[in-house]
Swiss-Prot record:
Domains: entry comment: Has three domains with a flexible linker between the domains II and III, and assumes an 'L' shape. In the assembled complex, domain III contacts 2 of the RuvB subunits.
Organism, as annotated: Salmonella typhimurium (strain LT2 / SGSC1412 / ATCC 700720)
Listed Pfam families: HHH_5 (PF14520), RuvA_C (PF07499), RuvA_N (PF01330)
Protein name as it appears in the record: Holliday junction branch migration complex subunit RuvA
Listed GO MF terms: ATP binding; four-way junction DNA binding; four-way junction helicase activity
Region (Domain III): 156-203
Region annotated Flexible linker, chain positions: 143-154
Gene3D superfamilies for this protein: 5' to 3' exonuclease, C-terminal subdomain (1.10.150.20), DNA helicase RuvA subunit, C-terminal domain (1.10.8.10), Nucleic acid-binding proteins (2.40.50.140)
Residue span of region Domain I: 1-64
Stretches the record annotates as Domain II: 65-142
Length: 203
């Protein structure tokens, strides 16, 4: 089992980062809330990983800290929530925001996430709330807002296309993803900024 990777970022294609360690390039799927905090390509990064084996694929999911990974593992134990949906949930809101939404039973915030209907949101609140009681020490200390670094490289159409592709990968329908990006698009924004702003606007 691969639990942690330390290496050089070769490529960032939201929501996937290609990380080289020991001469091997690992494709790691990351929630966008974690992806925003990665350094630029060519720099070193450390990610905590969860390895998922399926019949048709072997996938690595990466996180900036163990707490985010713990939450991801708990999410995929929930009936009807697989790794892809868990990734979408933690892209739409930070791990701390999700914990807060569950503990405050904010159904409205959860159903705005892609792939989450009312029944799934209710199930998440019921199942995750119980698990948080035993996990609190392992999860989060008092809430701290994430400081998101502004990504470099300004682009325009390419950035918009990348942002749409990333939102589709997170579970949004292509037309919906295009609409979300066009609403907040601006010429100097990078794809990461567009994704972040589109997800914020959706909530």
């Amino acid at each position: 089992m691969i639990g942690r990777l330390r290496g050089i970022i070769l490529e960032k294609q939201p929501p996937i980062v290609l990380l080289e360690t020991g001469g091997v390039g690992y494709e790691v799927h990351m929630p966008m809330t974690c992806f925003y905090e990665l350094p630029e390509a060519g720099q070193e990064a450390i990610v905590f990983t969860h390895f998922v084996v399926r019949e048709d694929a072997q996938l690595l999911y990466g996180f900036n800290n163990k707490q985010e990974r713990t939450l991801f593992k708990e999410l995929i134990k929930t009936n009807g929530v697989g790794p892809k949906l868990a990734l979408a949930i933690l892209s739409g809101m930070s791990a701390q925001q999700f914990v807060n939404a569950v503990e405050r039973e904010e159904l409205g915030a959860l159903v705005k996430l892609p792939g989450i209907g009312k029944k799934t949101a209710e199930r998440l609140i019921v199942e995750m709330k119980d698990r948080f009681k035993g996990l609190h020490g392992d999860l989060f200390t008092p809430a701290v807002d994430l400081v998101l670094t502004s990504p470099a490289s300004p682009t325009s159409e390419d950035a918009e296309q990348e942002a749409v592709a990333a939102l589709v990968a997170l579970g949004y329908k292509p037309q919906e993803a295009s609409r979300m990006v066009s609403k907040i698009a601006r010429p100097d924004a990078s794809s990461e900024t567009l994704i972040r702003d589109a997800l914020r606007a959706a909530l």
